[in-house]
Amino acid sequence: FGCARNADAIIPSLDQFEFYSGGGIDITFLGMGEMDQYGNVNVSHLNGNLIGPGGFLEIAQNARKVVFCGTFDAKGSKIDVTPDGLHIAQSGQIPKLVTQVEKITFSAAYAQQSGQEVLYITERAVFQLTAEGVELIEIAPS
């Protein structure tokens, strides 16, 4: 695996999770299956299918800053990036920004209580978590 080349440290999985739980992560970049207006994120149960969170919980809940990255929608979206900006030829069939997520894998309320800084980045816009919910802070040029 390419990521194992020139490693600064190779540690057992158990020790890695202890590092996560101990607050060793300053910033993490994670994918998002869907997010809602409150800032909650779901990666564990999508379209009625149980996927499971894996190590997502330990990483997302214990990092000081969390940056969620994902597309605005899924399945069939056609987007071009040109010198003039973003061109959306076709939106996807499955929205990923929803009123309420199917299951809460990342709790925005817990993040607020913990003092985490949280950003949500899509190809169309950037949002941040505030006390009032999710705030739009940047729109991609188009």
PLM regions: where:
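Conserved phosphate- and dinucleotide-binding cores of soluble alpha/beta proteins
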Residues: F1-P141
